[in-house]
C-alpha cells in the first residue's frame, strides 16, 4: 500500500515538472519561420528564384510562388 502511494506521488510530481517546463518554454523560440524554411529547403529538393512553380505542389526554396514563378 505504501509503495503504491509512493509510486503515485512520484508520477504526479514528474508530470507536474513536465508541465511546468513545457509552459516555461512557450514563446521563447525565436525566428520560427526562418528555421522552418531552412528545414524545408534541406529536406526537399526546391526550385530557385525565377524558376517555374506550382501553387499545388509547393516547391520553391524562397517560400513563395507568384504568377507561376518562385519569388
Swiss-Prot record:
Propeptide cleavage-removed residue intervals: 23-45
The entry's keywords: Amidation, Calcium channel impairing toxin, Disulfide bond, Ion channel impairing toxin, Knottin, Neurotoxin, Presynaptic neurotoxin, Secreted, Signal, Toxin, Voltage-gated calcium channel impairing toxin
Disulfide bonds: 46-61, 53-65, 60-70
Residue(s) carrying Cysteine amide: 70
Main localisation: secreted
Disulfide bond found in the keyword field: yes
Family matches, as Pfam families: Conotoxin
GO cellular component: extracellular region; host cell presynaptic membrane
Domain of life: Eukaryota
Record InterPro entries: Conotoxin, Conotoxin_omega-typ_CS
Entry comment describing in which tissues the protein is expressed: Expressed by the venom duct.
Signal peptide: 1-22
Site keyed Important for calcium channel binding: positions: 58
GO molecular function per UniProt: calcium channel regulator activity; ion channel inhibitor activity; toxin activity
Subcellular location: Secreted
Family: Belongs to the conotoxin O1 superfamily.
Function: Omega-conotoxins act at presynaptic membranes, they bind and block voltage-gated calcium channels (Cav). This peptide selectively targets Cav2.2/CACNA1B (IC(50)=160 nM) voltage-gated calcium channels. When tested in mammals, this toxin displays an analgesic potency similar to MVIIA in a range of acute and chronic pain models in rodents, but has less adverse effects (tremor, diminution of spontaneous locomotor activity and bad coordinated locomotion) compared with identical dosages of MVIIA injected intrathecally.
Domain comment, as recorded: The presence of a 'disulfide through disulfide knot' structurally defines this protein as a knottin.
Miscellaneous information on this protein: Negative results: has no effect on R-type calcium currents, voltage-gated sodium currents, delayed rectifier potassium currents and transient outward potassium currents.
Name this polypeptide is given: Omega-conotoxin SO-3
Species per Swiss-Prot/TrEMBL record: Conus striatus (Striated cone)
Amino acid at each position: 500500500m505504501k509503495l503504491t502511494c509512493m509510486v503515485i506521488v512520484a508520477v504526479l510530481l514528474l508530470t507536474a515538472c513536465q508541465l511546468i517546463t513545457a509552459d516555461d518554454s512557450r514563446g521563447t523560440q525565436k525566428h520560427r519561420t526562418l528555421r522552418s524554411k531552412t528545414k524545408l529547403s534541406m529536406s526537399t529538393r526546391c526550385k530557385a528564384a525565377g524558376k517555374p512553380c506550382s501553387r499545388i505542389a509547393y516547391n520553391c526554396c524562397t517560400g513563395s510562388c507568384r504568377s507561376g514563378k518562385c519569388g
